[in-house]
Amino acid sequence: MKSVRYLIGLFAFIACYYLLPISTRLLWQPDETRYAEISREMLASGDWIVPHLLGLRYFEKPIAGYWINSIGQWLFGANNFGVRAGVIFATLLTAALVTWFTLRLWRDKRLALLATVIYLSLFIVYAIGTYAVLDPFIAFWLVAGMCSFWLAMQAQTWKGKSAGFLLLGITCGMGVMTKGFLALAVPVLSVLPWVATQKRWKDLFIYGWLAVISCVLTVLPWGLAIAQREPDFWHYFFWVEHIQRFALDDAQHRAPFWYYLPVVIAGSLPWLGLLPGALYAGWKNRKHSATVYLLSWTIMPLLFFSVAKGKLPTYILSCFAPLAILMAHYALLAAKNNPLALRINGWINIAFGVTGIIATFVVSPWGPMNTPVWQTFESYKVFCAWSIFSLWAFFGWYTLTNVEKTWPFAALCPLGLALLVGFSIPDRVMEGKHPQFFVEMTQESLQPSRYILTDSVGVAAGLAWSLQRDDIIMYRQTGELKYGLNYPDAKGRFVSGDEFANWLNQHRQEGIITLVLSVDRDEDINSLAIPPADVIDRQERLVLIQYRPK
């Protein structure tokens, strides 16, 4: 009976966090609008081999993540939930692997359930796991690969070991097809300390080739298909998207070595109080094979991405699966022996909630700021933000009432965030980061446009997805579409600032021409170097400029 109650509670938890509130949040640009539009175009064109964005070749990532996103929009429609359905599914599958792996290690159902709940409620997991990017997919394949490797190394028969390594190769292959060759490097680095300490080199060398074969066979059909269709894909993807992004001096998203320290700290909320103890207990218990495996799985990718020049918070998502297991194991021991860490965790959550309440007041219309984040007419959004932090502090307090039994309720600290964040985003943010909001405000003007030009790829993708058209033209800036725009058949999909006046004269009689520009909040529109327009409609950071036939 208790197991049934736990399962009902888990399903209610998943529904409140990962299902019910998702449609209330508009898509963010540039990431969510980009991936939404790529998958929409894949469904519209029926081309499941070559990814396209705005009708242009888009070689930044391989294909598998787009497949999953496309299936999400196919099943649930071109809406906010449909766009995010794939990442939510991947996150829940990863949580299922956390459950299975914990049961495999300790045969303890309560520990497995707690590890799962901790994983799903970690701030970084929730933030990325409900955000339409490819990282939840690669995290799933990496976690599946680590589970497969453990399964292979614990098998007692050659059939079991062979099956485990074959499965490892398939997961690595799908990882390569999702985000590239990092799906090969990360698992290898993660298992090496464990293999070395356990002296399991023999099994690795005897059966490892099976993983290589199954990985190659997994990637080969699509790899050959895209090489035939687009011969330069692999050169661009390997050199630009791997070497330049991570290793060279001009790498994308450059950040210092310590970049991930605050990411791990913030990402560990609402379980931050367990982080030091979980890592220390894992190190102290390093003679235990499973603990070494979890510790290595957590630390090695973190070090690898810290050394790389290019860094983003999403890169280390897979590290939090083993960390959640370590946290759950440590928390149960602390509840029995010394609940100090659990009390500290409760106080951290109270402090975070109270700090958020104060910060919300400071940036509200009633605070001391001359330019508040929310305007007076958005008072309901301020109260939503207050509710988010109040619930966080309340559940932090509740865990302290009987800490040995109530500490798991820290998982409910982000409940307000999950349910209300979509209602608390300030209009000034929505106007710049949510193209759907802009489209809703300007739908009547945009819909009849013969040509639409914009200077932002993220906005262009948002316009394309919302209006169900892929012929948006880039104006002045090419951004990440630079490579695709270099192809001969992409001629006419970019107009520079100097060419715009002539281009306008040539095309004006064909129909309404709409220019959507991103501007600074205090920028004077009249100072823009563009021909006089028939219509100007400013929505804070985005402005619609329209030219009608003469």
Swiss-Prot record:
Q: Which gene encodes it?
A: arnT
Give one GO term, molecular function aspect.
mannosyltransferase activity
Name the NCBIfam families on file: PRK13279.1
**Annotated keywords:** Cell inner membrane, Cell membrane, Glycosyltransferase, Lipid A biosynthesis, Lipid biosynthesis, Lipid metabolism, Lipopolysaccharide biosynthesis, Membrane, Transferase, Transmembrane, Transmembrane helix
Can you quote a single GO CC term?
plasma membrane
Catalyzed reactions: 4-amino-4-deoxy-alpha-L-arabinopyranosyl di-trans,octa-cis-undecaprenyl phosphate + lipid IVA = lipid IIA + di-trans,octa-cis-undecaprenyl phosphate
**Biochemical pathway:** Lipopolysaccharide metabolism; 4-amino-4-deoxy-beta-L-arabinose-lipid A biosynthesis
Kindly give the InterPro entries that the UniProt entry links to this protein. ArnT_tfrase, Glyco_trans_39/83, LipidA_mod_glycosyltrf_83
- EC? 2.4.2.43
Q: Which Pfam families match?
A: PMT (PF02366)
Q: What protein family does this chain belong to?
A: Belongs to the glycosyltransferase 83 family.
Q: What is this protein called?
A: Undecaprenyl phosphate-alpha-4-amino-4-deoxy-L-arabinose arabinosyl transferase
> Which spans are transmembrane here?
7-27, 81-101, 111-133, 137-154, 165-185, 204-224, 263-283, 288-308, 315-335, 346-366, 382-402, 406-426
Q: Name one GO biological process term.
A: lipid A biosynthetic process
Q: Does the keyword Transcription regulation apply?
A: no
Membrane topology label: Multi-pass membrane protein
Top-rank taxon, per record: Bacteria
User: Which compartments does it reside in?
Assistant: Cell inner membrane
Function, in words: Catalyzes the transfer of the L-Ara4N moiety of the glycolipid undecaprenyl phosphate-alpha-L-Ara4N to lipid A. The modified arabinose is attached to lipid A and is required for resistance to polymyxin and cationic antimicrobial peptides.
EC class, as a word, reads transferase
